[in-house]
UniProtKB/Swiss-Prot annotation:
Keywords: ATP-binding, Kinase, Nucleotide biosynthesis, Nucleotide-binding, Transferase. It comes from Chromohalobacter salexigens (strain ATCC BAA-138 / DSM 3043 / CIP 106854 / NCIMB 13768 / 1H11). Its EC number is 2.7.4.9. The lineage of its organism: Bacteria, Pseudomonadati, Pseudomonadota, Gammaproteobacteria, Oceanospirillales. This is Thymidylate kinase. GO terms for molecular function: ATP binding; dTMP kinase activity. The keyword ATP-binding applies. Transmembrane segments: none annotated. Phosphorylation of dTMP to form dTDP in both de novo and salvage pathways of dTTP synthesis. SUPFAM superfamilies: P-loop containing nucleoside triphosphate hydrolases. Belongs to the thymidylate kinase family. InterPro entries: P-loop_NTPase (IPR027417), Thymidylate_kin-like_dom (IPR039430), Thymidylate_kinase (IPR018094). ATP binds at G11, G12, E13, G14, V15, G16, K17, S18.
Amino acid sequence: MTPGRFITLEGGEGVGKSTNVAFVCDWLSARGIEVVRTREPGGTPRAEAIRELLLDPAPQEPLDETAELLLMFAARAQHLAARIRPALARGAWVVCDRFTDATFAYQGGGRGLDETRIATLEALVQQGLQPDLTLLLDMPVEAAQRRVERRGIERDRFERERGAFFNAVRESYLARAAQAPTRFAVIDADRSLEAVQASIAAHLTERLASWS
C-alpha cells in the first residue's frame, strides 16, 4: 500500500490556521482522499491531556521552559505512535494543525531555547519523519493580535505572551521556511479568506500533480 501524505499548517496566533486546516481537509476529501485531521499539541487522549498542561492560562506553578519543551515532545511521541504513523501506513493523508516547526518557532525562537537540543529531541521522537508539505500562514504580528482580541474569549498561556515573543516566533518560522523551500509554502494570511484559500488551493493542486 502506498503511504499517505503528511501536510502541516503552521503560523503564529491569529493567522487563521484552524479555519484553513478545515479548508485543506475539505479540499482533499472532495478529491476522494481519505483525510485524518489532527492537531498539536494533542491529537490523542493522552496527548490532549498534555495539551491541557501546556495551555493552562492559570497554572498552580510556573512551567519551566525545559519542562515545556519536553512536554511538547512527549505529546508528539504519543501522537505519532497512536495516530499519525498508523494513518499514514494505511494510506490516509494526515492534515495537522502545527507540528515540530512550531516547537522550533515557539520554544526555540520565542523562548530562546537551544535549537540543537530541539533537533536532538526531534531526531529521537520522529525517526526521520517530516511533513511532505508545510503551509506557513504568515502575517504581521500586530494584525494577527488584533484578530485574537476580536475573538473575545479567554486566552491560553501562549496567547498571553507579548508582541516581542510573537515577533521572534514569526522570524523563526520564516527562517525555517527559507531553509526548506521545497517543503514550505509561505502564504500571505493578511488578506481576505477567499484570497488565502485560493493560494492554498493553488499550492495543493501543484503538489498533487507532482506526487501523482
